[in-house]
Amino acid sequence: MRFVRYALVLVVAFEVAVGECFLAAARPFGHAWPVAALAAVLGNVSLGVAGARALERPGGSAGPGLVWVGVALTLASGRQGSDVVVPNTGRGVALLLAGAAAAAGVVAVTVAGKNGTTPEGHLRR
């Protein structure tokens, strides 16, 4: 049953990544705010924690991040004559960097929490 839950987390990670990539060019209220980068951080942290809980292992937090990075890089790169969803602007780069950093950060925190190397880890022993 946990693999079904984990597969659902991966599907949601795919959908969230596509939505955030289309938000990269958004201009809310006429201003160039990096809304997609904020959504990427919040989405990757929450999906990483959900992946670790669904798989019941700290390594489960890596899957949603890898799916997100794969989708974001695919939509950011274009071939000759094709469209690019993530623009090559500051907001597009902020989306890619913030999302990848959040995905890596949640993996580091969940694995460190399992190994007891966090500041609170010695209290759990």
What are these regions (language model features)?
Residues 5, 99-125:
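Membrane-water interface at the C-terminal end of transmembrane alpha helices
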Residues 16-38, 72-96:
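Membrane interfacial helix motifs at helix-loop boundaries and amphipathic/re-entrant anchors
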Residues 59-72:
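Central hydrophobic cores of alpha-helical transmembrane segments
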Residues 23, 27-31, 55, 59, ...:
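Membrane-interfacial segments
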Residues 39-44, 97-101:
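Hydrophobic alpha-helical transmembrane segments
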Residues 42-56:
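Canonical alpha-helical transmembrane segments
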Residues 3-7, 31-35, 39, 58-59:
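Structural motif marking the loop-to-transmembrane transition
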Residues 1-18:
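Alpha-helical transmembrane segments and their cytosolic membrane-interface
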